[in-house]
């Protein structure tokens, strides 16, 4: 009989740019170690491992051309370095207060599990679980769309005083706007 607890479990985070320091990676690692009792591998994908605790496995970002939250789309590469089995992705600002074992044990046969945003009709991308290598079309379709259909627009958000990158699909009417990775991942999964 197959025991799901024997399957490879990976917890992956991504650190890019300067928004979150290495300390966020170190804290997330500590919370995962305290709250995940299943055997697992913790990996941080990053372009700069400075300050990340030496016990944390770091691997380089593969697609440095992906910007802002779209950096997450490289999680769907096949292969994603040597990572195999289930991947639980966690944003660096995630706070873990209780056991996260069930994030791996709930519906182990499911190829993708994500949390639905309560205020929008798409999946949240701060926490989701999927099988490594099973969804390369998420990034492949993104690459095709960016090259052939999208225009970029930088929008200033007065509330955060940040400039955000948005992509407009010029082939849809009205033009669809992808404000971040969450909307694109949801669209790609729904289209399949």
For each feature predicted by the language model, list its residue ranges.
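Glycosyltransferase catalytic domains, chiefly GT-A lineage
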Residues: 2-192
């Amino acid at each position: 009989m197959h025991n799901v607890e024997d399957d490879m479990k990976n917890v992956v985070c991504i650190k890019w740019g300067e928004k979150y320091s290495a300390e966020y990676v170190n804290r997330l690692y500590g919370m995962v170690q305290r709250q995940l009792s299943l055997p697992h591998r913790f990996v941080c994908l990053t372009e700069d491992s400075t300050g990340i605790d030496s016990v944390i496995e770091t691997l380089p970002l593969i697609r440095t051309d992906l910007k802002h939250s779209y950096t997450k789309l490289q999680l769907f590469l096949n292969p994603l370095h040597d990572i195999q089995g289930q991947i639980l992705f966690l944003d660096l600002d995630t706070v873990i207060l209780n056991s996260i074992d069930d994030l791996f044990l709930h519906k182990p046969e499911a190829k993708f599990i994500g949390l639905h945003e309560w205020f929008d009709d798409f999946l949240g991308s701060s926490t989701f679980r999927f099988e490594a290598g099973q969804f390369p079309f998420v990034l492949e379709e993104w690459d095709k769309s960016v090259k052939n259909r999208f225009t970029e627009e930088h929008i200033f958000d007065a509330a955060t005083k940040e400039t955000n990158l948005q992509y407009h699909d010029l082939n849809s009417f009205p033009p669809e706007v992808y404000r971040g990775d969450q909307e694109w991942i949801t669209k790609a999964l729904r289209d399949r």
